[in-house]
Regions:
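Glycine-rich phosphate/diphosphate-binding loop of Rossmann-like nucleotide-binding domains
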Residues: 200-315
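Rossmann-like adenosine-cofactor binding region
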Residues: 263-369, 374
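Adenosine-phosphate binding glycine-rich loop
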Residues: 2-19, 24, 337-451
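Solvent-exposed alpha-helices and their adjacent loops that cap or buttress functional pockets
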Residues: 52-54, 67-71, 120-122, 188, ...
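N-terminal ligand-binding/catalytic initiation module
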Residues: 1-202, 440-449
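Predominant activation on well-ordered alpha-helical scaffold segments within soluble catalytic domains
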Residues: 8-9, 26, 100, 104-108, ...
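Active-site nucleophile and cofactor-binding loops and adjacent substrate-binding regions
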Residues: 69, 165-166, 201-208, 233-237, ...
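General beta-strand structural signal in soluble alpha/beta enzymes
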Residues: 159-163, 187-191, 234, 257-260, ...
Length: 451
């Protein structure tokens, strides 16, 4: 039994109730054995055993009062996973599906993702099973203030810097930041994704979607191709999807379809990101109950709305597929449909949206598969640039931030590509990303001793 298999079997026995975490660990550990073979000192230092266990987990109750005066109680978490290369960095997710296992999966992925950015950021993740959907602004503010009243003692600009994630946008980050400032009497860059009027960075909103497209475009360039004339399908219609759609169009491609939890929309003229943005903002406002992507056809009469599972987008013929919604939303049967319909490139805009079976099928059938820990790192990358701006007490222009984002994402592709080639796995970008991200963290942990 190999070192990675041994550690994985121990994890499965220890955490049988955390399937998402086991899935992430399986995907990562299953690809880094070549690096471990080249560095036997890692096993001697029990480095993997330390890597897969968080340095610290904070769990707490979050009591708050709703608009009817009734006390509600949710559960809050912060998984401070690894700080070998910098302060813990990773988003907060507010969603009823949030569990400790899910946050450990996201935190483990975040370690390698942050390492790949080349910026000094460790890995962490947090959140709550609170559901912001259908809540008033007042209720969301009360919840965020209660959440931060416990979290504030565990974070700081040089300790742990949270950001937004699913269910946590600019509004929630602002409420969290305000409460942190109130409790500590300090204005520090303790959160990223802030508003522009209080320390936020230009291009942060666009960063994940733009970064995804820059990464995929650099792959296409390495093959002597471009987005020009390519047909693209996108799963999702949130922040990542909107700006991926915009950047694809700017580079000459056409997005044929996108989706939400109620169905999917197909536009033969190409999805208009401004309409997507309008629908997304109405959803986020909290004033319009029942807003869905079906509204798209009100403004674009040539478009067709398909009620049902948003995974219907995977049935369309396309050159490039960009899953930008949630984990495990591109299944084996979807991969089979995409391959049958001519898809050549898949770039993950979300965290682990593709199942292991689907990923394997893509790789076995010659599809260039770009894993999320590299392809969607644009968001955390610009979060790191926001931390730099806060530390310098400066604000950079949109063009400066976007330029750094593009440069770093394109450089990241070559790091991943070169690492895959170095370990005899040319074209295996999953292995390239995992090994490249792992090596930097592993060397830092080794140098710092048993800690």
């Amino acid at each position: 039994m190999s070192y990675t298999q041994k550690v994985l079997e121990e994890l499965k026995a220890r955490y049988p109730e955390q399937p998402e975490f086991i899935q992430a660990a399986t995907e990562i550990l299953g690809t880094i054995q070549p690096a471990l073979d080249a560095h036997p000192e890692y096993e001697e230092a029990a480095l993997l055993e330390r890597l897969v266990e968080p340095e610290r987990i904070v769990m707490f109750r979050v009591p708050w009062v709703d608009d009817q005066g009734k006390v509600q109680v949710n559960r809050g978490y912060r998984v401070e996973f690894n700080s070998a290369i910098g302060p813990y960095k990773g988003g907060l997710r507010f969603n009823p599906t949030v569990t400790l296992g899910m946050l450990k999966f996201l935190g483990l992925e975040q370690i390698l993702k942050n390492s790949l950015t080349t910026l000094p950021m460790g890995g962490g993740k947090g959140g709550s099973d609170f559901d912001p959907k259908g809540k008033s602004n007042s209720e969301i503010m009360h919840f965020c203030q209660s959440f931060m009243t416990e979290l504030y003692r565990h974070i700081g600009p040089n300790t742990d810097v949270p950001a937004g994630d699913l269910g946590v946008g600019g509004r929630e980050v602002a409420y969290l930041f305000g409460q942190y400032k109130r409790l500590t009497n300090e204005w520090t860059g303790v959160l990223t994704g802030k508003g522009l009027s209080f320390g936020g960075s230009l291009a942060r909103t666009e960063a994940t979607g733009y970064g995804l497209v820059y990464f995929v475009d650099e792959y296409l360039k390495s093959r002597g191709e471009s987005f020009e004339g390519k047909n693209v399908v996108v799963h999702g219609s949130g922040n990542v999807a909107i700006y991926a759609v915009q950047k694809v169009a700017q580079l000459g491609g056409k997005v044929l379809a996108c989706s939400d939890t109620h169905g999917w929309v197909e536009d033969p003229d190409g999805i208009d990101y401004t309409v997507l943005e309008h629908v997304y903002n109405k959803k986020r406002s909290g004033h319009d109950k029942g807003v869905t992507l079906a509204m798209y056809v009100d403004e674009k009469p040539n478009a067709v709305w398909h009620e049902g599972d948003g995974r219907g987008v995977w049935q369309l013929p396309c050159d490039i597929a960009l899953p930008c919604a949630r984990e495990n939303t591109l299944l084996l049967e979807d991969a089979q449909a995409l391959v049958a319909n001519g898809c050549k490139v898949v770039g993950e805009g979300a965290n682990m949206p593709t199942t292991i079976e689907a990923t394997t099928y893509f790789q076995e059938n010659g599809v260039a598969f770009m894993p999320g820990k590299a392809a969607n790192a644009g968001g955390v990358l610009v979060s790191g640039l926001e931390m730099s701006q806060n530390a310098e007490h400066l604000s950079w222009t949109f063009e400066e931030v976007d330029g750094k984002l593009e440069q770093l994402m394109r450089g990241m592709f070559h790091n991943v590509d070169d690492t895959a080639k170095e370990y005899g796995q040319e074209g295996n970008f999953v292995m390239g990303a995992n090994i490249a991200g792992f090596l930097k963290v592993a060397d830092a942990m080794l140098a710092q001793g048993v800690c």
